[in-house]
A protein has these predicted regions:
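GIY-YIG nuclease catalytic motif and its immediate N-terminal context
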Residues: 1-69, 73
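Conserved short loop/helix modules at catalytic or binding sites
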Residues: 36, 67-113
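Residue-level preference for the first positions of well-ordered beta-strands
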Residues: 46, 209-213, 253-255, 302
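Flexible phosphate/Mg2+-sensing switch loops adjacent to catalytic phosphate-binding sites
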Residues: 74, 78-88, 237-252
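Short glycine-/polar-rich loops that comprise or flank the Walker A/P-loop
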Residues: 89-95, 112, 250-252, 332-334, ...
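ATP-dependent helicase/translocase motor core
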Residues: 109-112, 121-216
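Conserved helicase motor core of SF1/SF2 NTP-dependent helicases
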Residues: 185, 192, 196-205, 215-220, ...
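Inter-Walker segment of RecA-like/P-loop motor cores
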Residues: 253-303
């Protein structure tokens, strides 16, 4: 077997200002290395703007068929203090230009998505100024993507280990594991679309206390499904707003409830890094503070509950009610719960069979998502 060697990617670092860009452009145009010149001028390019803010970094990742024109467009927005481009006036700002002779539109979008996903998981990066990602249907071998990406990352790491830590360190991080930016399996994607459809329907009919139950064993990808669907609602809202579309059936009035302090930290970091906190304030809560803060008279639109088997069914600590799920349902139009039946063990979370059965009997079984390992036996059911 002949093993095809994937060519080395081009990774060029340029100071992020118009003069440095002009010099770089001149170098490219005058270069005797035809392949280098051709790759940067005639193939799509992935690029990263990064700058320091206090002790941390912020980044913007993009891809373009014309890197020089695209960068000038970004620079034209620098005077506006409300735009991320305003930060590029900082002398610490850098631009990385990334090219490869095999880049096509679909691959550069995948590389861009993976860079956004990785950089969002890096501890020293406090903000990734990108909108939603759009996973591609692949028109090339996935192994080639992994190979080219690893080479790009290695070169970026050579330049700055704080911004570009080891790939393995990223994949082990709690933020990466809970990130809404994972590429979903077909089953997860179906489940996500179905949940969103039900949310839109409930908002359209101005319903209250709608319950969507997502069941599955531990390790079936419910966490990623949960965070991805939660984030998607914000993305849809932003897109409709930016396109001046009717916002009646879109919502940014969404909350994520989690039970552990570590999870609160992780999801708050995700909300900060993706700019949700800046735009919408606190979107992540523990159940009791959420119940105490929001009133029955003014319900929020959507609440997602991760690990709903941990909700209390009796008063304990600062919780004075009898059933947290009941109390959440009274305060929201739609509640999406991720439920792990095998894990209902301790007494204060003791979901008596009757309570559980009562919920389920009010619910028509809607759909089983996939029989395979990823989301084996996730049932989506609604009241």
């Amino acid at each position: 077997n002949v093993i095809m060697r994937v060519a080395e990617p081009i990774v060029e670092k340029v100071q992020d200002n118009i003069n440095a860009l002009k010099i770089f452009e001149k170098q490219i145009l005058e270069s005797n290395n035809e392949k280098f010149k051709d790759t940067i001028l005639n193939f799509p390019i992935v690029y990263i703007h990064n700058w320091k803010s206090k002790n941390d970094y912020e980044v913007y990742v993009g891809e373009s068929n014309n890197i020089f024109q695209r960068t000038r467009q970004h620079y034209s927005k620098m005077p506006d203090e409300n735009e991320w481009q305003h930060n590029l006036s900082d002398e610490n700002a850098n631009l990385y230009v990334i090219g490869h002779e095999h880049f096509n539109k679909s691959m550069t979008l995948d590389i861009e998505n993976r860079l956004i996903h990785y950089l969002m998981s890096v501890e020293n990066i406090k903000k990734v100024h990108n909108g939603r990602n759009n996973p591609q249907n692949r028109y090339y071998p996935i192994e080639e993507l992994d190979d080219i990406f690893a080479k790009i990352w290695k070169k970026l790491r050579k330049d700055n280990k704080e911004v570009f830590p080891l790939e393995t360190a990223i994949k082990d991080s709690a933020i990466f594991k809970a990130s809404p930016l994972h590429k979903l399996t077909e089953e997860q994607q179906k489940a996500k679309e179905m949940i969103i459809e039900k949310v839109v329907k409930a908002l359209r009919n101005d319903e209250r206390g709608q319950l969507i139950f997502v069941e599955g064993e531990a390790g079936t990808g419910k966490t990623v499904l949960n965070s991805s669907t939660f984030y998607e609602l914000f993305c849809r809202y932003e897109e409709a707003k930016n396109n001046n579309e009717d916002l009646k059936y879109e919502t940014s009035n969404c909350f994520l409830l989690v039970n552990h302090d570590e999870q609160i930290t992780v999801y708050n970091q995700i909300a900060d890094k993706l700019g949700l906190t800046d735009k919408y304030g606190q979107v992540v809560y523990k159940p009791t503070p959420f119940i105490n803060k929001y009133s029955v008279d003014n319900p929020v639109d959507v609440v997602f509950v991760d690990e709903a088997h941990l909700l209390l069914t009796q008063g304990k600590q600062s919780y004075r009610g009898n059933n947290q799920l009941e109390d959440i349902l009274k305060r929201a139009k739609v509640v999406v719960v991720m439920f792990d039946e095998d894990q209902i063990l301790t007494t204060e979370q003791y979901w008596e069979d009757e309570i559980l059965e009562e919920y389920k009997s009010n619910i028509k079984r809607d759909m089983v998502v996939g029989e395979d390992k990823i989301i084996s036996g996730v049932n989506i059911v609604e009241e």
